[in-house]
């Protein structure tokens, strides 16, 4: 055995030097050194280039950074502790804050301007024109930034590329009729009043028009209220639904094809019946056939009459007084203005006739009316063009800036449509949740779902949410208001449990559920229509009242008959896709038994001796193209 080293023998001068060199390389500084240094900060700071870009901060980090810049010191107060509950994260404004914001919006709405094209003529050179356009555009950007900073207002994300605004200027200059396409559920958010002023500034002979798309989501009374409002404001408004009109035109085509096939089959059946049956049987069957054909003709004529009936003749028992008032208001409105806003849903031919008849002054081109279509990307501008042309003339996309250049499309020799790139114009909103629910901001890029879902819970009643999705939302506690709207967590927990959207920890995936709910809200499955000003929003939602009456009526019928009451379920798109699948299969994880064998063992059946050696591996299926795939890849179409 060797001699055991003592504790002091292992540390020498050489080892101490090595340790010091290693510690110096690691940036270690000894505190017990005799060297005295001082940081004067009088040299060049080479570390200043190692900066980190900060685009978004939390409220605490922002507060501390501002305090550090201001040179303020804070002392911790340990006794003043305030607990903020989780329900306070709703992100919605109180009634006082919303009233204050509406007042600010009304006071500063004249400052919401779109950039103007500087005046130019034939003698202006392209270089000078581009420079003046850049200068005016920069001034416009500065004015909006100053408005947002000084008044503490939130503006919608607007187009910041000058080339897109140049396309708008060209469309306005060459158009005789400028049509703003807006969403009928919230027209005032998507309408830009300053655009109408700019059109009149370019030429007095140009005509402004408002096209309310997706108007099939509104009832007749809701459309009538908006028509009266725009009539008082002196705005020419037209109601239209590109999706409903496309479906109607497709149904007409299918109906014509079906009628042609029925006529051919009828002639074949008649010839066959003449050869195979007696004259008596022919006479006995003809009255029934004539009766059925007459009934079908009467039904079709009745439907045509109901569709083509004039608006003044639309009348029900509950609408007689309203129609009388409306009929009395018509002469006054037509006397004061040269047009009358109808609440009817226009068809394709009627819309084209409206485009041709709305302009009566001199046109930019002789014998041709040019209609410029302007609007947000998500309001159905491209769908309107495709419905008019009955084929895909324009690519449809929800991303702003998808169309790079304007294009002219001739519907007929005397009518030309000028498609403008989708522009997001500046407008006021209260919160970012309102922009998400209006479809302005993409849902898939949402970072915080709490404010948006809280707004949905505030707008959509509890019974509508439960009936639409077939869920049971937890009721309020005894110490809470029984009529309060559900919280975001209550809705998303119930929806996640029902759909099976679970996280790895066994909890409902609220973020995934929120995306499904918000997409249903934007598409109109969860319908909420904003009313005109000075109308109560709760009184402007007749679909919610009808939904509640339908549920209560079903409960009364079940209770009066003595039968056990059944839960009224409303089948939605998700249920249809799940329960009506053409190929239903079970998915498993892990290694399974194949033909009674497990890998590396014999038959599983007990009592039989494994006397014969199995040749090869019977559970292996070589050359099987239908191999087992991962479950997450098989169900990737179900991901949000």
From Swiss-Prot:
SUPFAM superfamilies: P-loop containing nucleoside triphosphate hydrolases (SSF52540). InterPro entries: G_CP_dom, GNL1-like, GTP-bd, GTP-bd_ortho_bundle_sf, P-loop_NTPase. CDD domains: HSR1_MMR1 (cd01857). Residues 618-640 have a biased composition (Basic residues). It catalyses: GTP + H2O = GDP + phosphate + H(+). GO terms for cellular component: Cajal body; cytosol; endoplasmic reticulum. GTP binds at residues 213-216, 375-382, 419-422. Residues 251-341, 602-640 are annotated as: Disordered. PANTHER family: LARGE SUBUNIT GTPASE 1 HOMOLOG, LARGE SUBUNIT GTPASE 1 HOMOLOG-RELATED. Functions as a GTPase. May act by mediating the release of NMD3 from the 60S ribosomal subunit after export into the cytoplasm during the 60S ribosomal subunit maturation. This is Large subunit GTPase 1 homolog.
């Amino acid at each position: 055995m060797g001699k055991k080293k003592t504790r002091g023998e292992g540390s020498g001068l050489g080892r101490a030097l090595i340790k010091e060199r290693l510690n110096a390389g690691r940036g270690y500084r000894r505190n017990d050194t005799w060297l005295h240094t001082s940081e004067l900060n009088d040299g060049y700071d080479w570390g200043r280039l190692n900066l980190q870009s900060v685009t978004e901060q939390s409220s605490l980090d922002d507060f501390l950074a501002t305090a550090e810049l201001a040179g303020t010191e804070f002392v911790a107060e340990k006794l003043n502790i305030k607990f903020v509950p989780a329900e306070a994260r709703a992100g919605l404004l109180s009634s006082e804050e919303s009233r204050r914001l509406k007042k600010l919006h009304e006071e500063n709405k004249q400052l919401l301007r779109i950039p103007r094209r500087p005046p130019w003529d034939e003698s202006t050179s392209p270089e000078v024109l581009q420079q003046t356009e850049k200068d005016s555009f920069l001034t416009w950007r500065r004015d909006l930034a100053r408005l947002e900073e000084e008044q503490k207002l939130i503006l919608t994300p607007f187009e910041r590329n000058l080339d897109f605004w140049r396309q708008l200027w060209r469309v306005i200059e060459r158009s005789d009729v400028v049509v703003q396409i807006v969403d009928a559920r919230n027209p005032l958010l998507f309408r830009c009043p300053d655009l109408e002023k700019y059109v009149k500034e370019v030429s007095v002979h140009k005509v402004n028009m408002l096209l309310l798309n997706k108007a099939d989501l509104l009832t007749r009374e809701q459309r009538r209220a908006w028509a009266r409002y725009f009539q008082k404001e002196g705005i020419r408004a037209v109601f239209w639904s590109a999706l409903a009109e496309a479906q109607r035109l497709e149904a007409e085509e299918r109906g014509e094809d079906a009628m042609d096939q029925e006529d051919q089959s009828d002639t074949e059946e008649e010839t066959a019946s003449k050869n195979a049956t007696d004259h008596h049987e022919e006479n006995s069957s003809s009255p029934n056939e004539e009766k059925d054909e007459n009934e079908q003709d009467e039904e079709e004529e009745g439907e045509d009459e109901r569709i083509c009936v004039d608006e003044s003749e639309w009348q029900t028992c509950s609408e007689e007084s309203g129609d009388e008032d409306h009929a009395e208001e018509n002469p006054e409105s037509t006397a004061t203005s040269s047009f009358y806003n109808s609440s009817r849903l226009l068809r394709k031919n009627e819309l084209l006739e409206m485009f041709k008849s709305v302009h009566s002054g001199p046109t930019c081109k002789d014998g041709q009316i040019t209609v410029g279509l302007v609007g947000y990307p998500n309001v159905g501008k491209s769908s309107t063009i495709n419905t008019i042309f009955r084929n895909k003339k324009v690519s449809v996309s929800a991303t702003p800036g998808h169309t790079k250049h304007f294009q002219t499309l001739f519907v007929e020799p005397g009518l030309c449509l000028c498609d403008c790139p989708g522009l997001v114009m500046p407008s006021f909103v209260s919160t970012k949740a309102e922009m998400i629910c209006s479809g302005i901001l993409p849902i898939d890029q949402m970072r915080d779902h709490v404010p948006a879902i809280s707004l949905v819970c505030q707008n959509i009643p509890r019974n509508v949410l439960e009936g639409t999705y077939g869920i049971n939302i937890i009721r309020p506690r005894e110490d809470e208001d029984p009529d309060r709207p559900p919280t975001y967590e209550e809705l998303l927990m119930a929806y996640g449990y029902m759909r099976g959207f679970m996280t790895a920890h066994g909890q409902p995936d609220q973020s995934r559920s929120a995306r499904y709910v918000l997409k249903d809200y934007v598409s109109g499955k969860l319908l909420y229509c904003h009313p005109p000003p000075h109308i109560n929003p709760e009184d402007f939602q007749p679909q919610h009242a009808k939904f509640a009456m339908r549920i209560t009526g079903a409960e009364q019928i079940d209770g009066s008959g003595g039968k056990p009451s059944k839960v009224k379920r409303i089948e939605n798109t998700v249920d249809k896709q799940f329960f009506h699948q053409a190929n239903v299969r079970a998915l498993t994880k892990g290694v399974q038994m194949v033909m009674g064998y497990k890998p590396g063992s014999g038959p599983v059946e007990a009592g039989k001796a494994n006397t014969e050696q199995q040749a090869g591996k019977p559970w292996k299926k070589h050359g099987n193209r239908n191999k087992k795939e991962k479950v997450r890849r098989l169900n990737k179409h179900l991901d949000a």
